């Protein structure tokens, strides 16, 4: 079930403060965060976030199309290396 409209989108306070400070100073430094649960709001457009995926920080540049999604959606936590091809030698026995 989606979040109630009267509550508004969830954004961690420390993340919002860092974006506001950068907007005041007109700087665009990478903001390192572990907050994958934060919703992307219009204030984030044009900023780059380094979102933690469990072992490293993945750079995510926020665009208009990302507004309303969560930061964690753009930093995958699992790596898919493909299915193993059948071993033909084992089948001949």
Curated annotation (Swiss-Prot):
One of its GO terms (cellular component) is cytoplasm. InterPro entries: Ribosomal_uS19 (IPR002222), Ribosomal_uS19_bac-type (IPR005732), Ribosomal_uS19_CS (IPR020934), Ribosomal_uS19_SF (IPR023575). It comes from the Bacteria. Pfam families: Ribosomal_S19. One of its GO terms (molecular function) is rRNA binding. GO terms for biological process: ribosomal small subunit assembly; translation. Keywords: Ribonucleoprotein, Ribosomal protein, RNA-binding, rRNA-binding. HAMAP family: Ribosomal_uS19 (MF_00531). Belongs to the universal ribosomal protein uS19 family. Protein S19 forms a complex with S13 that binds strongly to the 16S ribosomal RNA. This is Small ribosomal subunit protein uS19. It comes from Mycobacterium leprae (strain TN).
């Amino acid at each position: 079930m989606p979040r109630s409209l009267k509550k508004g989108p969830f954004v961690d306070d420390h993340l919002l403060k860092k974006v506001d400070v950068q907007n005041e100073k007109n700087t665009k430094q990478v903001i390192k965060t572990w907050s994958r649960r934060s919703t992307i709001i219009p204030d984030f457009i044009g900023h780059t976030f380094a979102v933690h995926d469990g072992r490293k920080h993945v750079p995510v540049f926020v665009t208009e199309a990302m507004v309303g999604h969560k930061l964690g959606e753009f930093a995958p936590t699992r790596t898919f290396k493909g299915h193993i091809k059948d071993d033909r030698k084992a089948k001949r026995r």
